[in-house]
Design a protein with these regions (language model features):
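Glycine-rich dinucleotide-binding loop and its adjacent helix/turn
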Residues: 46, 136-191, 195, 223, ...
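Hydrophobic/small residue at the entry helix of a nucleotide-binding pocket
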Residues: 14, 38, 177
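Glycine-rich flavin
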Residues: 2-3, 20-27, 32-165, 198-202, ...
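Flexible, glycine-rich terminal cap/loop adjacent to redox cofactors
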Residues: 9-14, 23-35, 47, 51-58, ...
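FAD-site-proximal beta/loop scaffold in flavoenzymes
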Residues: 149-165, 245-319
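Glycine-centered short loops/turns at secondary-structure junctions
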Residues: 26, 189-191, 221, 415
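Short hydrophobic core segments
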Residues: 7-9, 113, 127-137, 172, ...
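Beta1/beta-strand and adjacent pyrophosphate-binding region of the FAD-binding site
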Residues: 1-12, 165-175
Length: 442
C-alpha cells in the first residue's frame, strides 16, 4: 500500500493549489482525479467561458470601430475553429498544472476514489494517508421542470462540447454563468433569450450594477424574462404563462450542487440543510485530519475562493502560517461588457453592522481615458465606515473592472483606509483615476 502525508481528492483550483503548497512545505502529496485535470473551472467553467467571451469582445470591437470611420465588415466565422481555440487554451493550462505537479513531486493519480470500510480505494488499490483534503466540487443542478427530462438540453458541463453554433439559444437561469454565456453568444449572431424565475437577473450583484448590465444586454438584443413561470419544456420550446419561447439549443444554467458522495461515505457532518460539508475556520470537517474546501463547503462558489480555502487548510495541516479566510476580501467578478467586480459588504449589509456608514459613487462618464476609449458606461462605488475610514466594500462597473477592483481590495486587505487611496498618485489618463476621485470625495 502506498501512503502519503496528504491526499487531495479533486484537481480543481482548490485541490491542485493546495497540493502544490503542501508539497512545497515538505509533505508527500498525491492528487486523485476521476475526470480531467483542472476541474470544472478549467475544463467547463471559468476558462472556456472567458475564451468564448473574448470572441464576443472581438466582434463588438469591430462594430464599435465602424461608428467612427472604420470600414464596416460583415462578421463571418467558423465555429469549430472557435471551439478549437478554446480547447487549445484549456490544453495549455492543463499542461501547466501537470508541470507544477512534476516540479513539486506531487503524484497525480487518475481514477475514481471511494471509501470502503473506512479505507481509501482507487482503481482497486488502497491508498494510505495522514491527512485528507476533499475538493470534489459540484455538478449542475437541473430543477424539476415539467418536460425538461424529455428535452435535449445542455448544462454548463456539456455546453462547451458543442461544435455546432446555436443559432437560437434559450437559457433557463439568470445567474453569472447564464448571463456570461448569453453575452458571449449574442455578438456572434445567436438569438438569445434568458428565462429567470426570480424577480431579476444577477440577484447576488449590486442593484445599480445589475441595472447597467441588464440594460446593456437588452440593447444587444437579448430577450430577458424575469419572474417567469415555466409551465412546460417541449422539444423545441419553453412554455411560459404568457409566451412560448422557441429554441434550437436549450441551456439549463440554474446553479450547481455540491458532490457529497465521498463526504457521505465518510460520515462527515453536513450543514442544517444537508447541502454542504460543515467545516471550521481552518476547513477541518467533523473528523480529525479530514478537510473540505470549495463548492463542497458553500460560501462563494468561486475558483479563487476554493484556492484560498485550500491554502488555509494546508496551513493548518502543516501547522505553518496558520490563518483564517476573510470572506469580505474575496472579489466577485462578472465578465460581460461592461464588467462588474465587487468585494465586501453591500450598503444594506454595512448599515446592519456599523453605525456610521458612508458611500460615494462616481461615473466613468467624466474620466478622460474612458471618454477617449469609448468606455464610459459604468461607475465606481466605495462603502466605508466613517469614524475610522475603514473600507467595507466596493463595486466597479465598467471596462476592466475585474482588474481594477484589486486596487481597492489591496488597501482594504492591508487594513488601510480610504484616505490612503486618496493620497495615492494615480497615472493619467487611466480608468483607475475614478477610484482616486471617489476616495477624495469622502
Amino acid at each position: 500500500m502506498t501512503s502519503y502525508d496528504l491526499v487531495v481528492i479533486g484537481s480543481g483550483p482548490g485541490g491542485y493549489v493546495a497540493a502544490v503548497k503542501a508539497a512545497q512545505n515538505g509533505k508527500k502529496t498525491a492528487v486523485i482525479e476521476r475526470n480531467q485535470i483542472g476541474g470544472t473551472c478549467l475544463n467547463v467553467g471559468c476558462i472556456p467561458s472567458k475564451s468564448y467571451i473574448q470572441h464576443a469582445h472581438w466582434v463588438l470591437a469591430g462594430q464599435e470601430a465602424a461608428k467612427f470611420g472604420f470600414a464596416k465588415q460583415e462578421v463571418s466565422f467558423e465555429f469549430p475553429k472557435l471551439v478549437a481555440r478554446k480547447d487549445q487554451v484549456v490544453k495549455k493550462l492543463q499542461g501547466g498544472i501537470h508541470g507544477l505537479f512534476k516540479a513539486n513531486r506531487v503524484d497525480y493519480i487518475e481514477g475514481e476514489a471511494s471509501f470502503e470500510n473506512g479505507k481509501l480505494m482507487v482503481n482497486g488499490k488502497e491508498i494510505g494517508y495522514q491527512d485528507l483534503l476533499l475538493a470534489t466540487g459540484s455538478s449542475p443542478f437541473v430543477p424539476p421542470i415539467n418536460g425538461v427530462d424529455q428535452a435535449d438540453y445542455l448544462t454548463t458541463d456539456t455546453f462547451f462540447k458543442q461544435t455546432e453554433f446555436p443559432k437560437q439559444l434559450t437559457i433557463i437561469g439568470g445567474g453569472v454563468i447564464a448571463v456570461e454565456l448569453a453575452f458571449a453568444m449574442r455578438p456572434l449572431g445567436s438569438e438569445v433569450t434568458l428565462i429567470e424565475v426570480a424577480p431579476d437577473i444577477l440577484l447576488t450583484e449590486d442593484e445599480e450594477a445589475r441595472k447597467v448590465v441588464k440594460s446593456q444586454l437588452q440593447k444587444m438584443g437579448i430577450k430577458i424574462y424575469t419572474q417567469a413561470k415555466i409551465t412546460e419544456v417541449k422539444k423545441d420550446a419553453v412554455v411560459l404563462d404568457e409566451v412560448v419561447v422557441p429554441f434550437e439549443k436549450l441551456l439549463v444554467a440554474t446553479g450547481r450542487r455540491a458532490d457529497l458522495t465521498l463526504a457521505k461515505q465518510l460520515g462527515l457532518e453536513l450543514d442544517e440543510r444537508q447541502r454542504f460539508v460543515k467545516v471550521d475556520c481552518h476547513y477541518q470537517t467533523s473528523q480529525p485530519h479530514v478537510y473540505a474546501i470549495g463548492d463542497l463547503v458553500g460560501g462563494y462558489q468561486l475558483a479563487h475562493a476554493a484556492s484560498a480555502e485550500g491554502l488555509c487548510a494546508v496551513a493548518a495541516i502543516c501547522d505553518k502560517d496558520k490563518h483564517t479566510l476573510d470572506q469580505t476580501s474575496i472579489p466577485r467578478c462578472l465578465y460581460t461588457q461592461p464588467e462588474v467586480a465587487s468585494f465586501g459588504l453591500s450598503l444594506e449589509q454595512a448599515k446592519e453592522r456599523y453605525e456610521n456608514v458612508q458611500v460615494k459613487k462616481m461615473a466613468f462618464a467624466s474620466n478622460g481615458k474612458a471618454i477617449a476609449s469609448e468606455e464610459t458606461n459604468g461607475f465606481v462605488k466605495i462603502i466605508i465606515e466613517g469614524k475610522y475610514q475603514q473600507i467595507l466594500g466596493a463595486v466597479i462597473v465598467g471596462a476592466h473592472a475585474t482588474e481594477m477592483i484589486h486596487t481597492i481590495l489591496a488597501v482594504k486587505e492591508s487594513e488601510g483606509t480610504i484616505d490612503e487611496i486618496a493620497r495615492m498618485v494615480f497615472a493619467h489618463p487611466t480608468l483607475s483615476e475614478t477610484i482616486s476621485d471617489v476616495a477624495k470625495s469622502f
